[in-house]
């Protein structure tokens, strides 16, 4: 199902806290990725929430995702920093039109092909894709 908003949000967890079943085992608060200009800001947020990024919490994963196809990837194995930087490079966090194209593309072609296109073409990943709406 297509989302109605390009406000992609994630919950970031760490394998260390998850395995320890400590207070961070359920991950961060919901992070709206459009609210952050770079990964350093997200790291600061995680540290403010008590994550020990140079210790127990150095191995991060995506625990939950909103406004993105949840079945598009095995989120346990997607690095949150790489995901954030991919979405930034694709311009989908700032451009609702690109977001709509991405959602349709992933529904038809899959997350890995989307990632490959962004890796190859950067923000011009969608230059040859046309999305026609009713």
Q: Predicted segments — roles?
A:
Residues 1-134:
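Acidic interaction surfaces
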